[in-house]
Amino acid sequence: YNIDRRRIYATGMSTGGGMAAVSACHMADLFAGVAGVSGAYYAPVNRGCQNLPIAFMALHGTNDTLTPYHGTIRRGMRVLPVTDLFRSYERRNGCAGGVDTRPAGYNATRVSARGCRKGVEVIKVHGSNHFWWYSPSAADEMWAFLSRHSK
C-alpha cells in the first residue's frame, strides 16, 4: 500500500481515545497526531512519553458521567481531567503560552493553545454527556485538525 508515513494518525472514543493518547505518548515517532472523543485518559497516560512534539485534540462533553471532563476515580484508577492532558501537550509541544477560545458549533467551545510546534486543541461540548457528536461533527473536526499536521 502507498501509505504516507508522515500522515499517520490515531483516533478513538472512550477507551479508544485513551488508547490514542497512550499512542501519542509512547509512539510519537510513528504518529503525526491523535484525537480522542470522550477519552478515558487514565493516569499515567501522559507520563514517560517520548520527548517529541505531536498534535493532540480532545472533544469532550462537560457533563460526561463515564469519563468526566474534570476527572474522577474509576475502578480505583484516576481518570485525568481533560485540562491536565491539554497542559501536558502544551509543555510537550513547546507552546508559547495562552489560548485562543472561540465557538465551535452549537453549544461548544474550541480552546487552542498558542505558538505550538504541533497543534493542541480541545473542543468542550457544553452540557453534553459521553457521546459521539454530530454538531459539531466529531469526525469532521478531527479530520480538519489532524489533516493540518504531518511529521
Model-derived features: positions:
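A conserved short beta-strand
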Residues: 29-39, 54-55
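Gly/Ser-rich "nucleophile elbow"/oxyanion-hole loop immediately N-terminal to the catalytic nucleophile
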Residues: 1-15, 25-30
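Extracellular/periplasmic catalytic domains that process cell-envelope and extracellular macromolecules
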Residues: 2-3, 26-29, 48-52, 113-119
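Short, flexible/disordered intra-domain loops and linkers
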Residues: 69-80
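Acidic catalytic loop of the alpha/beta-hydrolase fold
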Residues: 64-67, 130-132
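C-terminal catalytic histidine-bearing segment of alpha/beta-hydrolase fold enzymes
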Residues: 55-59, 80, 90-151
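Active-site nucleophile loop of the alpha/beta-hydrolase fold
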Residues: 35-43, 61-64
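Active-site loop->helix "elbow" adjoining a glycine-rich segment at hydrolase catalytic centers
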Residues: 14-19, 39
